[in-house]
Amino acid sequence: MLRSLALLASALLALAAAPASAQVTLLNVSYDVMRDFYKDLNPAFVKYYKDKTGKEVTIQMSHGGSSKQARSVVDGLEADVITMNQSNDIDLLAARGGLVPADWSKRLP
């Protein structure tokens, strides 16, 4: 869960560079179990972000099996945030997608 929040925070850094008038939309590709977690977290984050920046943000979700979701991203699904629950799926994102450093497990134990 901490990794999920860290990834979401990373995506937010990218939002800071968005033009003030732009509507920002994030796509979070996640595994099924997190559906209820984000159902509660996303509205709280949208409010927090609006209060802090004055900007609107919309969060879209894509849920599925972790391995299926990882494969979708490697195959071209343009995710802003990726939350996986299996280390082999994160390894796939590193090896085939180049989306995370190969040493991610040492950097984020």
Predicted regions and their residues:
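Bacterial N-terminal signal peptides
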Residues: 5-16
